[in-house]
């Protein structure tokens, strides 16, 4: 596993496993919402009324609807707080 994914994979997996709704902001400003169904090195499969395959290189930010606890290399990481009013960042 690449060093850059040592945080990314456990974080995305916690969001997937706990079925936490997420807002995904793309680099072009578009906001997508749904639950992470699956992911790999290059894409995230986002489920809402339809499934969308989102390429990671197009993603700016992933914002969970609530805090999530995740583990990184068997070390517990403090819960990540959901960001409120993130829409102002995209404007």
Curated annotation (Swiss-Prot):
Single GO cellular component term: cytosol
Organism: Haemophilus influenzae (strain ATCC 51907 / DSM 11121 / KW20 / Rd)
GO terms classed as biological process: regulation of DNA-templated transcription; regulation of RNA stability; regulation of translation, ncRNA-mediated
Keywords of this entry: RNA-binding, Stress response
PROSITE patterns according to UniProt: SM
Pfam families: Hfq
Domain Sm, first and last residues per copy: 9-68
Coiled-coil regions listed: none
Start and end residues of each stretch annotated as Disordered: 69-91
InterPro entries per UniProt: Hfq, LSM_dom_sf, Sm
GO molecular function: RNA binding
Gene designation: hfq
Family, similarity comment: Belongs to the Hfq family.
Keyword Transcription regulation tagged: no
Subunit structure as annotated in this protein's UniProt entry: Homohexamer.
Protein name: RNA-binding protein Hfq
Function: RNA chaperone that binds small regulatory RNA (sRNAs) and mRNAs to facilitate mRNA translational regulation in response to envelope stress, environmental stress and changes in metabolite concentrations. Also binds with high specificity to tRNAs.
């Amino acid at each position: 596993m690449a060093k850059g994914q040592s945080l990314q994979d456990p974080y995305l997996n916690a969001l997937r496993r706990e079925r936490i709704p997420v807002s995904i902001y793309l680099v072009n400003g578009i906001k997508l919402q749904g639950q992470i169904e699956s992911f790999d090195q290059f894409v995230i499969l986002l489920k809402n009324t339809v499934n969308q395959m989102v390429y990671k290189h197009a993603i700016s930010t992933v914002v969970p609807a609530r805090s999530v606890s995740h583990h990184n290399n068997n070390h517990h990481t403090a819960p990540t707080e959901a960001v409120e009013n993130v829409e102002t960042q995209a404007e």
